[in-house]
Regions:
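Sec-dependent signal peptide recognition
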Residues: 2-9
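C-terminal motif of bacterial Sec signal peptides marking the signal peptidase cleavage site
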Residues: 16-17
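GH16 jelly-roll
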Residues: 20-22, 41-42, 46-351
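Short, low-complexity, disordered segments immediately C-terminal to signal peptides
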Residues: 22-41
């Protein structure tokens, strides 16, 4: 009996001791709120940022020509004679006319009218009705020799692509001759909005092989010289006796998404001589054509026009309007599309 009391007292003392040690603690206070964090822009791939929109791909759903070559052997053409007089003879255009400088050759004879206004497209012009795009362009041409009749004429002629889109601006490529001095060629591409045009350009004296200029900028302001792969080839061989008014030459350029190559051939059987192979990089940021290479279809044309600002190099006085109906001869003009490049553009643009 005594042992039972002893066990009871021991258990009571143990419970009392444990009860004193197991005093419940008050609940812990809540943690302080975290400081606000700034939202960091990201790429939208799990980092909590906003997705950066992809740049818009300029696109217009237009009819683009298949391959063609117009040799002007007939009085009519599938090409358009710009601003031609309707219902009567227009002395500015004579298709299938015997050449004044080559035997057994019929040409498109284009005569500039002293009454024509100033500017591209204001003089005689043969131009596609629909559009052309990435591809190879060429024309066999001869410009007039005006140096004895009017040495300070301000007139340009050449092979062009040109269009103005209301949203995206200008798409233009020029292979130009300025007839006050037909020993030089003027190569250029044009993008941007009217009044804010961007250009890349190269001027070459083909009679000597001298590259006079290779630069980029706005319509009338140089931003810098082009170097490295944008200035290739860095030298050009002279073409002995080159004079665009003395004989026909074949002028051309190849237009691709990443490059434009201007070239010349002495005749139908000769190899192309590369005058400029421009490979694009960002020259004009925050524009639809940052590389300076046009990105939209345009119209292909041969044109003869008066300009008081497109001066022949070193001839600042050569800006007079034409005093006589000087003639330009076009033997043929041709276009071969780079269809794979055009199809890729269509596929991307319609997404």
């Amino acid at each position: 009996m005594r042992s039972r009391h002893i066990l009871f007292l021991a258990a009571l003392l143990l419970a009392t001791a444990c009860g004193e040690k197991y005093t419940p603690l008050p609940p812990a206070p809540p943690p302080p709120p975290l400081p606000p964090t700034e939202e960091v822009p990201g790429d939208g791939e799990g980092d909590g940022g906003q997705e950066t929109p992809e740049p818009e791909i300029p696109f217009k759903d237009v009819t683009i020509y298949p391959e063609f070559k117009e040799d002007f052997s007939e009085s009519s053409s599938f090409l358009r004679f710009a601003a031609k007089v309707n219902g009567g003879e227009d002395f500015r255009y004579y298709s299938a006319h015997p050449s004044l400088s080559a035997t057994n050759t019929k040409v498109m004879m284009m005569r500039i009218d002293p009454a024509d206004g100033e500017g591209w497209g204001k003089g005689p012009q043969v131009i596609t009705k629909d559009y052309t795009f990435y591809g190879s362009y060429s024309a066999r041409m001869r410009v007039p020799d005006i140096r004895k009749a009017q040495k300070n004429i301000g007139a340009a002629a050449g092979l062009y692509v040109h269009d103005i889109d209301e949203k995206y601006g200008v798409s233009g490529i020029d292979f130009e001759l300025r007839i006050a001095d037909p020993t030089k060629v003027y190569l250029s591409a044009w993008t941007g909005k009217e009044g804010e045009l961007n250009r890349i350009s190269r001027t070459i004296d083909l009679a000597t092989g001298k590259i006079i200029d290779c630069s980029y900028g706005t319509d009338d302001t140089e931003k810098g010289k082009l170097t490295d792969e944008q200035n290739a080839p860095s030298t050009v061989s002279a073409i002995n006796g080159f004079d665009a008014s003395k004989q026909f030459y074949i002028y051309g350029f190849d237009w691709k998404p990443e490059s434009i190559t201007w070239w010349i051939r002495l005749n139908d059987n000769s190899e192309k001589v590369t005058l400029w192979e421009f490979k694009g990089k960002e020259l004009f940021p925050d524009t639809y054509a940052p590389s300076g290479i046009p990105v939209l279809p345009a119209h292909n044309a041969t044109s003869f026009w008066h300009s008081s600002s497109r001066l022949a190099h070193g001839m600042n006085s050569a800006k007079e309007a034409p005093k006589y109906p000087f003639e330009m001869e076009i033997d043929w003009m041709a276009y071969t599309p780079f269809q794979d490049e055009i199809d890729k553009w269509k596929e991307n643009g319609k997404k």
